[in-house]
UniProtKB/Swiss-Prot annotation:
Chain residues that bind S-adenosyl-L-methionine: Y72, G120, T172
Protein's name in the database: FeMo cofactor biosynthesis protein NifB
Residue sites binding [4Fe-4S] cluster 2 per the record: C297, C300
Protein species of origin: Trichormus azollae
Taxonomic lineage: Bacteria, Bacillati, Cyanobacteriota, Cyanophyceae, Nostocales
E.C. numbers: 4.-.-.-
Disulfide cysteine pairs (residue numbers): none
Gene Ontology biological process: nitrogen fixation
Gene3D superfamilies associated with the record: Aldolase class I, Dinitrogenase iron-molybdenum cofactor biosynthesis domain
Length: 475
């Protein structure tokens, strides 16, 4: 259960003199969601940045087949050590998937969303996908259902999606130009025929646009995922953003290409690089004036379980969950959710109190800070235990989430690993400080030598970040 909000417990907050300049960026956006839309996504950790601090999700791997071959994808069905889309430890039948959901719904009552995202395409496996949704809708009606698709077969199944009360659909749409698509997709299999090059990309785009419009007409929320590929579609994504907004998508998730050679993808094996953090943020910021941007995506496995950034899938492998009795308890789950919502109200009040009276000043430099958090909107994790840092932009009057950055945790077997520490420093090198619940003297001193200050606290993220900024900016 998320802890209640308490008063400040900052144990160290004595930043050194401010340096000139800042991060030179702006994540602000004029796009806001209306109240009705916010209510629909309030407990969806993938669709709501605020909800992902409190609620968990899970994916079930019932859809192995795919009808397109993306150059950034290599599906794996028995892989436990890679964290990326298209990868699972094992495939499940719809009945096994439903059993797993009921087990986890009891073990992790803050799990509110069940998604099918692969490892292939859910709509290339319609019987397994919809059978799974039917079973879960019948046995766990409080769990939101969603799916992620390339969109090729979407127009044919929107009515079925609506019938099953699947309220959230994600389309992966990387381009609106078939010539660019020819560089991203090796082939597209449609109506028993395989198409290559721009012809295949054109067919895919037509169906994606049809599907997007059909979702809008059916009042089904649509998020669009786009993989940013430097030199191919990076300069084109602003056009994609404008088009999908016009067609009815409400959220755009621009993700970095994952292209490590060991993953075996075409792009990985041919040396296509992914974008830097700076390049990714630049494109996201360019698009943020048109529609709401998703910046908290973890590019999850197709069998992910738990809070975003906290994958617990290996706790629930088939050999384990099949031996567990379902513990789904609707009333208990509602009680947990009520507690979370009560805490969210307290957290909102605490944030408003922190931000009250903070006047926006254009001359204030913007800086980045890295946060070690286990969720709940708090600075509440030990530096050595963090497997990722959430990065926020601070300007003295606002604190805005920018991104998350994965790292290997520093403390392993009770000792700090030097190689791991060096990688952490590199990962957060553009941050003025790291905000943690606790940190040892040795890593604290090493961070300071690298130009990164530390703040030890257990409190609301915005409060700790603004307190640091005020002292940093005093000089």
């Amino acid at each position: 259960m998320t802890p209640p909000v308490t008063g400040s417990s900052v144990t160290e907050s004595t930043p050194t003199k401010a340096k000139s300049g800042g991060c030179g960026c702006d994540t602000s956006t004029t796009v806001e969601m209306d109240e009705k839309l916010q209510e629909r996504i309030a407990k969806h950790p993938c669709y709501s940045e605020e909800a992902h601090h409190h609620y968990a999700r899970m994916h079930v791997a019932v859809a192995p087949a795919c009808n397109i071959q993306c150059n950034y994808c290599n599906r794996k069905y028995d892989c436990a050590n890679e964290s990326r889309p298209g990868v699972v430890s094992e495939l499940l039948t719809p009945e096994e998937a439903a059993h797993k959901v009921l087990v986890i719904a009891g073990k992790i009552p803050q799990m509110t969303v069940l998604g099918i995202a692969g490892p292939g395409d859910p709509l290339a496996n319609p019987e397994k996908t919809f059978r799974t949704f039917e079973l879960i809708a019948d046995k766990a009606p409080d769990i939101k259902l969603c799916l992620s698709t390339n969109g090729l077969m979407l127009p044919e199944y929107v009515d079925r999606i609506k019938q099953l009360n699947i309220d959230h659909v994600t389309i992966t749409l990387n381009t609106i130009d078939p010539e660019i698509g020819a560089q991203i997709y090796s082939w597209v299999h449609y109506k028993r025929r395989r198409y290559r090059g721009a012809e295949g990309a054109r067919i895919l785009l037509e169906k994606q646009m049809e599907g997007l419009q059909a979702l809008r007409e059916a009042d089904i929320l649509c998020k669009v995922n786009s993989v940013m590929i430097p030199g191919i579609n990076d300069q084109h994504l602003v056009e994609v953003n404008k088009m999908i907004r016009e067609q009815g998508a409400f959220l755009h998730n621009i993700m970095p290409l994952i292209s490590a050679p060991e993953h075996g993808t075409h792009f990985g094996l041919t040396g296509q690089r992914g974008p830097s953090q700076k390049e990714l943020k630049s494109v996201q910021d360019q698009c943020s004036g048109n529609m709401k941007m998703m910046r908290h995506c973890r590019q999850c496995r197709a069998d992910a379980v738990g809070l975003l950034g906290e994958d617990r899938s290996q706790e629930f492998t088939k050999d384990k969950f099949l031996e567990m009795a379902p513990e789904y308890d609707f009333d208990k789950r509602q009680e947990v959710h009520e507690g979370i919502e009560k805490f969210r109200v307290e957290l909102k009040v605490a944030k408003e109190k922190v931000l009250a009276g903070k006047e926006k000043t254009a001359s204030n430099p913007k800086i980045l800070v890295a946060i070690a958090t286990k969720g709940g909107g708090l600075v509440n994790q030990h530096f050595g235990h963090a497997k990722e840092f959430q990065v926020y932009e601070v300007d003295g009057s606002e604190v805005r989430f920018v991104s998350h950055r994965k790292v290997d945790h520093y403390c392993q077997g009770g000792y700090g690993e030097e190689a791991t520490f060096d990688n952490i420093v590199k990962t957060i090198a553009d941050c003025k400080a790291v905000l943690v619940s606790k940190i040892g003297e040795s890593p604290k001193e090493k961070l300071l030598q690298a130009g990164i200050q530390t703040v030890e606290a257990y409190d609301v993220i915005e409060k700790v970040a603004l307190e640091f900024y005020e002292q940093w900016n005093k000089g």
